[in-house]
Amino acid sequence: MACSTLPKSPKDKIDPRDLLIPLILFLSLKGARSAAPGSSPHQVYNITWEVTNGDRETVWAISGNHPLWTWWPVLTPDLCMLALSGPPHWGLEYQAPYSSPPGPPCCSGSSGSSAGCSRDCDEPLTSLTPRCNTAWNRLKLDQVTHKSSEGFYVCPGSHRPREAKSCGGPDSFYCASWGCETTGRVYWKPSSSWDYITVDNNLTTSQAVQVCKDNKWCNPLAIQFTNAGKQVTSWTTGHYWGLRLYVSGRDPGLTFGIRLRYQNLGPRVPIGPNPVLADQLSLPRPNPLPKPAKSPPASNSTPTLISPSPTPTQPPPAGTGDRLLNLVQGAYQALNLTNPDKTQECWLCLVSGPPYYEGVAVLGTYSNHTSAPANCSVASQHKLTLSEVTGRGLCIGTVPKTHQALCNTTLKIDKGSYYLVAPTGTTWACNTGLTPCLSATVLNRTTDYCVLVELWPRVTYHPPSYVYSQFEKSYRHKREPVSLTLALLLGGLTMGGIAAGVGTGTTALVATQQFQQLHAAVQDDLKEVEKSITNLEKSLTSLSEVVLQNRRGLDLLFLKEGGLCAALKEECCFYADHTGLVRDSMAKLRERLTQRQKLFESSQGWFEGLFNRSPWFTTLISTIMGPLIILLLILLFGPCILNRLVQFVKDRISVVQALVLTQQYHQLKPLEYEP
């Protein structure tokens, strides 16, 4: 900052009323916080806070595993690190980031005199311009930053208020005029209620002097995030500041930035063929037999056949059909173990439309971890909502009244930075989605609430009579039966002791293995469904291609066309009995329907069979039956009705004739005779 020898007053500040509008705008956006798009706020990422120089190169960084927007460490880069590849007056314009402290050391230090030293660090310091290229200059810089009459001040960059137009740009280190500074270590102690950071020294004067004498970076800063900075979610793009030394003459300065990096966000979707349909593998085909190769003919010998030795090949990845078959196979084994009467003969059906999974609320004991476990970093983007959870279980957080019916026990968590991990075979169903573990920091900072649930695939159980009746030619419409899902049949299996292997003996061990197979199949299918949803959300292809991304519907269509399942309404059904799951379910369905048809025909009489064997005869009879009945009624009751009608007409005619004759004659009065 260009400055005369006049004292610099801290009174020339920006009027606080000028900051009122930006402050209101900031408070209005304060609640607009979100985690990574499409992810759970409790998901743990590998977070890295980076401090950059004026060329946007990283010169210092710190990493940790935490949920987004919950970890705000103190950043401690050295002041000279910010000057690497920076302005020439710092003496480090040719030094790359992460370089060691350059220049000759002092001639005295903790290790004694050093060869090639430049000056004695113990001699009195002069008022030379502080630089970073030697140990002597870094010691002088330490004197400036710790002296009460000198120091440094920091001015915000692009995120400053619009009214601060006089603060300039990077050329003036965002400090072109007084009043632009918001933090620093100078005697007037600048401050701000809206800036994102505060900057101070991280070492005392005596500590810094000793480190400088040892030819190390000896001017570390302490950058702390303010409450306003902790509410901002734009750190991934970076924010920038300018720093200037408060010395006599022209104040030297530099610019630096702070940005956030986080990993484990999933694969990026390239522009091109849609990856959702890329792994639609067909059913495995048998490998062709190797062709015999003839050996070179030898003299006086017959040719011999030599079979080439098979070369080991890696098994192909599991296709969509195999994945869904594994899911149904695991469901069958778990059902056969717990309810063997249900698997005498049954059909297990996969639904083609969402939801593909349902949850059962359970009670369980979660584990408490001070550091994030490995499974907390697993991406959890499953679209299960609390409206699809049944039962009563363990709840955490502030549960609204509309969902308190799911809670048998509600726990309030204490403040702190720790993680709650769900027991094996369960997960947390929160109002933000599914997650294997919860962050106490996120729960205390938000209004999130969660329920401990078991996840069960939406596999529908049907008795054989219902399935066969849907494929038979029946003219009677029966009432739709109540569908039983796997969650209703096996709900509470995990916390009931089977998954944990409760008990001793073979039964408990087998039960654990059966459930683990189902659990593994569920996890594989959830990953594929999640991948399809992610690709669908990020797809840049045409609408017709997006419509084809109904992954589960396509998977079931492939199974149906391959004869592996029977299509029943919107479900793909597999036949199962005590021998196991039948892969060729369509052949089994045809066989059972043929058997039922023969049994039905054998129990019918010749008259009923006539109607079943001649469909045209049924149509003919139903067409002429009405006219024939009417004609028969006419023949039976027609003569009687006709006679009655004729007699009635005759009677009326006779009455009319009598009336006519009566009108032509007059009645004579009787004569009276006198005595």
Curated annotation (Swiss-Prot):
<dbReference type="GO" id="GO:0016020">
    <property type="term" value="C:membrane"/>
</dbReference>
<feature type="disulfide bond">
    <location>
        <begin position="376"/>
        <end position="430"/>
    </location>
</feature>
<feature type="disulfide bond">
    <location>
        <begin position="346"/>
        <end position="349"/>
    </location>
</feature>
<dbReference type="GO" id="GO:0020002">
    <property type="term" value="C:host cell plasma membrane"/>
</dbReference>
<feature type="signal peptide">
    <location>
        <begin position="1"/>
        <end position="34"/>
    </location>
</feature>
<feature type="glycosylation site" description="N-linked (GlcNAc...) asparagine; by host">
    <location>
        <position position="368"/>
    </location>
</feature>
<keyword id="KW-0862">Zinc</keyword>
<feature type="binding site">
    <location>
        <position position="89"/>
    </location>
    <ligand>
        <name>Zn(2+)</name>
    </ligand>
</feature>
<protein>
    <recommendedName>
        <fullName>Envelope glycoprotein</fullName>
    </recommendedName>
</protein>
<keyword id="KW-0732">Signal</keyword>
<feature type="region of interest" description="Fusion peptide">
    <location>
        <begin position="482"/>
        <end position="502"/>
    </location>
</feature>
<feature type="disulfide bond">
    <location>
        <begin position="395"/>
        <end position="407"/>
    </location>
</feature>
<feature type="region of interest" description="Disordered">
    <location>
        <begin position="276"/>
        <end position="323"/>
    </location>
</feature>
<feature type="disulfide bond" description="Interchain (between SU and TM chains, or C-349 with C-573); in linked form">
    <location>
        <begin position="346"/>
        <end position="573"/>
    </location>
</feature>
<keyword id="KW-0945">Host-virus interaction</keyword>
<dbReference type="InterPro" id="IPR008981">
    <property type="entry name" value="FMuLV_rcpt-bd"/>
</dbReference>
<feature type="coiled-coil region">
    <location>
        <begin position="513"/>
        <end position="547"/>
    </location>
</feature>
<keyword id="KW-0449">Lipoprotein</keyword>
<feature type="glycosylation site" description="N-linked (GlcNAc...) asparagine; by host">
    <location>
        <position position="375"/>
    </location>
</feature>
<feature type="disulfide bond">
    <location>
        <begin position="565"/>
        <end position="572"/>
    </location>
</feature>
<dbReference type="GO" id="GO:0046872">
    <property type="term" value="F:metal ion binding"/>
</dbReference>
<feature type="compositionally biased region" description="Low complexity">
    <location>
        <begin position="296"/>
        <end position="308"/>
    </location>
</feature>
<keyword id="KW-0261">Viral envelope protein</keyword>
<feature type="disulfide bond">
    <location>
        <begin position="107"/>
        <end position="117"/>
    </location>
</feature>
<feature type="short sequence motif" description="YXXL motif; contains endocytosis signal">
    <location>
        <begin position="665"/>
        <end position="668"/>
    </location>
</feature>
<dbReference type="InterPro" id="IPR018154">
    <property type="entry name" value="TLV/ENV_coat_polyprotein"/>
</dbReference>
<keyword id="KW-0946">Virion</keyword>
<feature type="disulfide bond">
    <location>
        <begin position="167"/>
        <end position="180"/>
    </location>
</feature>
<feature type="glycosylation site" description="N-linked (GlcNAc...) asparagine; by host">
    <location>
        <position position="46"/>
    </location>
</feature>
<keyword id="KW-0325">Glycoprotein</keyword>
<comment type="function">
    <text>The transmembrane protein (TM) acts as a class I viral fusion protein. Under the current model, the protein has at least 3 conformational states: pre-fusion native state, pre-hairpin intermediate state, and post-fusion hairpin state. During viral and target cell membrane fusion, the coiled coil regions (heptad repeats) assume a trimer-of-hairpins structure, positioning the fusion peptide in close proximity to the C-terminal region of the ectodomain. The formation of this structure appears to drive apposition and subsequent fusion of viral and target cell membranes.</text>
</comment>
<feature type="topological domain" description="Extracellular">
    <location>
        <begin position="35"/>
        <end position="620"/>
    </location>
</feature>
<comment type="function">
    <text>The surface protein (SU) attaches the virus to the host cell by binding to its receptor. This interaction triggers the refolding of the transmembrane protein (TM) and is thought to activate its fusogenic potential by unmasking its fusion peptide. Fusion occurs at the host cell plasma membrane.</text>
</comment>
<feature type="transmembrane region" description="Helical">
    <location>
        <begin position="621"/>
        <end position="641"/>
    </location>
</feature>
<keyword id="KW-0812">Transmembrane</keyword>
<feature type="disulfide bond">
    <location>
        <begin position="80"/>
        <end position="132"/>
    </location>
</feature>
<feature type="topological domain" description="Cytoplasmic">
    <location>
        <begin position="642"/>
        <end position="675"/>
    </location>
</feature>
<keyword id="KW-0165">Cleavage on pair of basic residues</keyword>
<keyword id="KW-0472">Membrane</keyword>
<feature type="short sequence motif" description="CX6CC">
    <location>
        <begin position="565"/>
        <end position="573"/>
    </location>
</feature>
<dbReference type="GO" id="GO:0019031">
    <property type="term" value="C:viral envelope"/>
</dbReference>
<feature type="disulfide bond">
    <location>
        <begin position="212"/>
        <end position="218"/>
    </location>
</feature>
